[in-house]
Structure formats: C-alpha cells, structure tokens
Amino acid sequence: MNTKEISKVVDLVRESNPLVHNITNVVVTNFTANGLLALGASPVMAYAKEEVAEMASIAGALVLNMGTLRPDEVEAMLLAGKSANRNDVPVLFDPVGAGATSYRTEVARHIPAEIELAIIRGNAAEIANVINEKWEIKGVDAGAGNGNVVSIAKQAADELNTVAVITGKEDVVTDGERTIVIRNGHSILTKITGTGCLLTSVIGAFVAVEKDYVKAAVAALTFYGVAAELAAAKTVEKGPGSFQIEFLNQLANTTSGDIEKYGKIEVI
C-alpha cells in the first residue's frame, strides 16, 4: 500500500457523495456536518429511536459516537447498528472517553458485543479500555499509558473482528494482519474540539466508497492529516480559530495529488 494507491479514494468520495448517518455528540454536531460537507459527503444527524433504523438502512455508512452519553442515545445506537448490519451498511464506532467512568466503559464494551463493526476508532486509552486492557485516561483524552499502541490495535482488531484505528501523534490502522502507520497531521488539531470525532465520520465517508476498510481508513487518515498540515501552514501563527476555518477549506480543497505528494505512510 502506498500514497498513489490510496490517493484516489478521496476522488471516489467526491464523485459518489455518500450519505453518512451520524449518531454523534452535541459538542461536535455542527463541526462534523460542515466537515463532511466540505469533503464532499452528505451528512445526516438522525437520533430518534423511531427513525434511526430506517435511516441507517439507506446510508452509505453509520457512525456511532458516544461523546455525550444518554440512555436514549445508546438505545438509538443499538437500533441503528443492528439495522445497518442487516442491510450491509458499514458501522464505525468512536468510544469517546471509554475508561473515564464505569457507565461509559460499560457502553463502550456493550456496543461492539451487539453490533458488527467495520471500524473502531479512538485514542490508545479508549481502545485499550474497550478490550479491558489497562491504560491511563484523563477525561476523554489519552493518558500517558505505557502499552504498545500497535499491539493494542492488533488485539482490538482480533478480539472485535474489525479494523482498529488508533490515533495520536502517529496513527495506526490494522485488521490484525495488515498494519499501517500514518505520520501526517499537526498538533494544533488538539486545540479544536471535535477533530477526532469529525475524523471518525470522515473515515465513514471513505468506508462508504471503498470496501477494503484498511485501505479506506489509511486513505482517510492521510487525507485528514495532509489537510491539517496545509491548513496549519497558513494559519498556525494566528491561532486555533483561524485554523478551524482554514481546515474546513482544506477538507474541500485537498486533492488526491496532495495526498500522493505529502502523505507519509509505512506498512509495518
């Protein structure tokens, strides 16, 4: 796998305009919708249990994000996820803050037990806690755990029968057999709330058009990281507000050629 091979997936997203059904958190809803629109996907935010199964059945991908947990949202996620499974719609799960509280951890482990996942995406602490491995956590952000990120990712992929994506300074994608590290991105992403949540939804748009989920995830992460680098080059000295606006611009303007030129991926 190389940057030339993955670079074309962004073109497929823009040509296909896939419908991405998000059951996400209240903090990031607007940013997520605008980011998907900028990319060229079509977002829908449908949360009511009365409609989520129907909406999920017609989507290109379903993204479940437990950032602001409520029991009614968990019920909606389970209904939507099972509908997506019945209709061969890929499901992505973002276990935000898994390990922070007992309830959050319980939900983070229950959803993969009930729903077949195409992708699970989180930081190292979150993924470790989903599979009951010890890792420090502070709020919804990764702590300074000492575990090996690649081994945690592989273990999660094997135990959950999915593609595991662990993001951080370097990003890891694995299905338990193929493992790729992506080294794009910029530290200013951590100064904007919701960039990780949007990333999961962007991966959803790529998964909707590329059925090799490892390739789709690597392409999405590389695209996202390159877009962040290009945005930071123009705005980082101005601050996170200017960066956020320019980042949306770059989600719209970053090309397959940019991915091929600036992407940094390594198969390990």
Curated annotation (Swiss-Prot):
Keyword DNA damage belongs to the record = no
**InterPro entries from the UniProt entry:** Hyethyz_kinase, Ribokinase-like
Q: Name the UniProt key words of this record, in alphabetical order.
A: ATP-binding, Kinase, Magnesium, Metal-binding, Nucleotide-binding, Thiamine biosynthesis, Transferase
SUPFAM superfamilies, A to Z: Ribokinase-like
Highest rank taxon of the organism? Bacteria
Any one GO biological process: thiamine biosynthetic process
Q: Which family does it belong to?
A: Belongs to the Thz kinase family.
> What does this protein do, in the record's words?
Catalyzes the phosphorylation of the hydroxyl group of 4-methyl-5-beta-hydroxyethylthiazole (THZ).
Q: What is this protein called?
A: Hydroxyethylthiazole kinase
